[in-house]
Amino acid sequence: MERVASIMYLYPGNQEEYKKRHDELWPEMKEALKAHGAANYSIFLEEKTDTLFAYVEVEDKAIYDKIAETEICQKWWKYMAPIMKSNPNNSPVAVDLKEVFYLA
């Protein structure tokens, strides 16, 4: 498993809505994540800056990245775009993080 981490950014005032939408994550989106090899997926919020930290373990990063091509993922991005910084294609603005320490 490969560990993948990134940060994303909420627009101010959207912390509760972001959590609500993830509490109600569409079953089709859950299935797509699992089908693309995602496991142990967590998202944390730094409340003072509206910064999100996402961590996911993937079987194969290339396969995981293909989720972006799915209709359900693109629909999810469009649904989330009004509450977080997004790219022109509605994908979240995300900064990939480099792992600098790991303790098994």
UniProtKB/Swiss-Prot annotation:
Its main location: cytoplasm. Keywords: Carbohydrate metabolism, Cytoplasm, Isomerase, Rhamnose metabolism. The keyword Isomerase applies. One of its GO terms (biological process) is rhamnose catabolic process. Substrate binds at residues 18, 41, 76-77. It is found in: Cytoplasm. Belongs to the rhamnose mutarotase family. HAMAP family: L_rham_rotase. This is L-rhamnose mutarotase. It comes from Listeria innocua serovar 6a (strain ATCC BAA-680 / CLIP 11262). The lineage of its organism: Bacteria, Bacillati, Bacillota, Bacilli, Bacillales.
